Amino acid sequence: MNGQPVRVTVVIDHPAQHFTRALQLLSAEPGVQVHVYYWSAAERVRDAGFARSVSWDVDLLRGYPWRAPEPGRSMSGRIRWLVRQLRARRPQVLICYGWASPIARLALLYCMLTRIPVVLYGDTTWQHSAAQGRHRVLRALVLRVLMRASAGAISTGAFNREFYISCGMDPRRIWPGVCPADTELFGMARAGSRTPPGAGRTPLRIGFAGKLIARKGVDELLRAAALLPSTRDWSVTVVGDGPLMPELQALAAELGLAERVTFRGFANTTEMPALLAAFDVMVVPSRWDMRALVTIEAMAAGAAVIVSDATAVWGPGDLVEDGVSGLVYRSGDPAALGRQLSRLLEDPGLLATLRRTAAARVAEFGPDAFARTMASAIRTLHERAKATTGP
């Protein structure tokens, strides 16, 4: 691209671990000049899903330009702050992560009034939308207006692309993209060659990582594990915390799994690569979920994955292809999950193949792919705008 770089503003509610490296790489892309605006950049936040205050042990704000309002500002003060920032910045393209947060709604309204092209980015699916339940019809109408008013969207998977199209987005204005995890970091922790589970009395190490809340389906994993043969060597490790911790511990005891299931508790960012690399298989038993980035992290760390069909990470050409780069089972059916676990317990060759394929597949879902696809969409959109309105 010749001339000045495209001025790009990215609006996000708060910093997140999986975006840090991606934003660093996007900021380094040629032809784009990126500034990130947060609604809050607080270093310690209360996370209801983990049932605790969380302070991540990595710097989420290093390596890219960003701004956020001072802590303690009122809502009206934050609104005035963002409007001043957008007026001063004069973005040529605005990337909006989601549309439900205050910063997203304000930025979208500002851009509609000032005719700044907006590119939508997120991981919503119709399954997630239906799960919201309330005001469904009104929400659908608002989304249709938003899709038609936006310059385009970045899809983060087949289900997300279908969501945009069903809301009225022209498929020609949807670019393929990535909802990234730091695949390089987790790949570095990948376990080396080890004795296949079942050979030499090596146990099958089954894992879960995430918030202990109802929709994550950890109870389903425990019920499935209870169906595995007690004569075989296997274990389950649950990494994470949340309001259901006591209930899940009681369920494990009730199912006779107290000696096989370990509740590791909350793990911070720098602890996760080694924990996931220690798993033979990661289970994502969500009752509904969007991109479930822990799936990418586990695959990069060398684990095979089993995901429920209520996640949005599977399907032809997506992250998990059933029987190729992972296994899929019907959500709500512990027996089906138990059968998939039994397959890996009985067939070390299948497990080894899935682990190798998973580690190779995630190369397409890392922060470099995010930066590359996002920058390509920005350049294309800017060139189209110039062709329509002139430089």
Question: Which positions does each model-derived feature cover?
Answer:
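Nucleotide-sugar donor phosphate/pyrophosphate-binding loop at the beta->alpha transition
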Residues: 117-119, 126-149, 191
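Donor nucleotide-sugar binding/catalytic pocket of nucleotide-sugar-dependent glycosyltransferases
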Residues: 136, 147-194, 201
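Conserved donor-binding/catalytic core segment of Leloir-type glycosyltransferases
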Residues: 198-216, 222-225, 237
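A short, well-ordered alpha-helix in the C-terminal region of glycosyltransferases
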Residues: 260, 336, 343, 350-364
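Short alpha-helical donor nucleotide-sugar binding micro-motif in glycosyltransferases
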Residues: 266-267, 274-279
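Aromatic "clamp/platform" in nucleotide-sugar-dependent glycosyltransferases that forms part
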Residues: 287
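Short hydrophobic beta-strand element within catalytic cores of glycosyltransferases
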Residues: 304-311
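Conserved acidic donor-binding segment of nucleotide-sugar-dependent glycosyltransferases
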Residues: 321-323, 327-334, 342-349
